[in-house]
From Swiss-Prot:
Has 3 domains, the large (RuvB-L) and small ATPase (RuvB-S) domains and the C-terminal head (RuvB-H) domain. The head domain binds DNA, while the ATPase domains jointly bind ATP, ADP or are empty depending on the state of the subunit in the translocation cycle. During a single DNA translocation step the structure of each domain remains the same, but their relative positions change. It comes from the Bacteria. Residues 257-361 are annotated as: Head domain (RuvB-H). The lineage of its organism: Bacteria, Bacillati, Actinomycetota, Actinomycetes, Micrococcales. It catalyses: ATP + H2O = ADP + phosphate + H(+). Its main location: cytoplasm. Residues 1-183 are annotated as: Large ATPase domain (RuvB-L). It is an enzyme of class 3 (hydrolase). InterPro entries: AAA+_ATPase, AAA_lid_4, DNA_helicase_Holl-junc_RuvB, P-loop_NTPase, RuvB-like_N, RuvB_C, WH-like_DNA-bd_sf, WH_DNA-bd_sf. GO terms for molecular function: ATP binding; ATP hydrolysis activity; four-way junction DNA binding; four-way junction helicase activity. DNA binds at residues 312, 317. This is Holliday junction branch migration complex subunit RuvB. One of its GO terms (biological process) is DNA repair. It comes from Pseudarthrobacter chlorophenolicus (strain ATCC 700700 / DSM 12829 / CIP 107037 / JCM 12360 / KCTC 9906 / NCIMB 13794 / A6).
Length: 361
């Protein structure tokens, strides 16, 4: 079983209180996601001007980018109470009916992991979202009757990491859909500056940059790394965190310059040293690193593929040229991805230009 990772995007239970304290409370304080913020701000402002509940909202994107925070901001901006539940908790239509029937007018219902809701509950949600009404079935068999239950107008905010699993009829009932993207390093630095202020930490610009560069483009990870660097600084008597102290702290936690942790590096090391860069089957690779197949596939692979370090092919997994370079190995001829590296000077990083020649006929 994989040990807990500092760079896993999922939220740990013990982090929830700290995360809640660091969450922005309004759109003005929310850093990043400029396009989604601008569009959402307009939707909410128009709803307030009309004096009506906001349209139903769906946020999609990888974990840790702010979907839950934005749901809370929707409720705050609409000055409405917030009810929180999740897809896995709603396994029967009756579970959903109980929640919907207790909503007050204008209330915001947040359903996290909405794609994991049961199909009967999804079908009940269609009518609730569109007509603010549900049919409660009483009895069984031929004697069963449907009793209509009117609902007060409410706003549903759904969040999903797998929008493709949502049925089309459900997606179509959301009046606004916002897809959240990974953050740039400068955006993460802004997130860290805000969090450091709330935590009363002294961090210079180089320190913020060092932490942001290892945060995988994810604010949740950035805040987690900041707290671990804070612990290191406290124990070592460091008053102001700079690049050197941040690097020393994160090196101790085995989070490298690219944000790779022990498992990530183990996967790449095994690919290169045991299988010559691949291709190798997923199950064989998992055995080589001493982890479950699902752990390698769901925990390590997404980030490695996104960073261009690992490739998936019909014949198996392969180590891309940047993986060889990152781990300090010489790249053998024919490694996939080497062509992209050869466009740049390996020492200076400057683009290599040459005289263009037409292909031979």
């Amino acid at each position: 079983m994989a040990e807990p990772s500092l760079v896993a995007a999922g939220e740990e239970p013990e982090e929830r209180a700290i995360e809640a304290a660091l969450r922005p409370k309004n759109l003005d304080d929310f850093v990043g996601q400029h396009r989604v913020r601008k569009q959402l701000s307009l939707v909410l402002k128009a709803s307030r001007m009309r004096g009506r509940s906001a349209d139903h909202v769906l946020f999609s994107g990888p974990p840790g980018l702010g979907k839950t925070t934005l749901a809370m901001i929707v409720a705050a901006e609409m000055n409405a109470p917030l009810r929180i539940s999740s897809g896995p908790a709603i396994q029967h239509a009756g579970d959903l009916a109980a929640i919907l029937s207790s909503l007050s007018e204008g209330e915001v219902l947040f359903l996290d992991e909405i794609h994991r809701m049961s199909r009967p509950a999804e079908e009940m949600l269609y009518m609730a979202m569109e007509d603010f009404r549900v049919d409660i079935v009483v009895g069984k068999g031929a004697g069963a009757t449907a009793i209509p239950l009117e609902l007060p107008p409410f706003t549903l905010v759904g969040a999903t990491t797998r929008a493709g699993l949502l049925p089309g009829p459900l997606r179509d009932r959301f009046g606004f859909t916002g897809h959240l993207e990974f953050y740039s390093v400068p955006e993460l630095e802004l997130v860290l500056r805000r969090s450091a202020g709330l935590l009363d930490l002294k961090v210079n610009s180089a320190g913020f940059s060092e932490i942001a560069g290892r945060s995988r483009g994810t604010p949740r990870i950035a805040n987690r790394l900041l707290r671990r660097v804070r612990d290191w600084a406290l124990v070592h008597g460091v008053d102001q965190i700079d690049a050197r102290s941040a690097s020393a702290a994160l090196d101790m936690y085995e989070v490298d310059k690219k944000g790779l942790d022990r498992l990530d590096r183990s996967v790449l090391e095994a690919l290169i040293t045991k299988f010559g860069g691949g291709p190798v089957g997923l199950s064989t690779l998992a055995i080589a690193v001493g982890e479950e197949t699902e752990t390698v596939e769901t925990v390590a692979e997404p980030f490695l593929v996104r960073e261009g370090l690992l490739g998936r092919t019909p014949r198996g997994r392969i180590a891309m040229a940047p993986a060889w370079t990152h781990l300090g190995y010489a790249i053998p001829a024919g490694v996939f991805g080497q062509e992209q590296l050869d466009l740049f000077d390996r020492e200076t990083g400057a683009e290599v230009t040459g005289e263009w020649a037409p292909e031979s006929q």
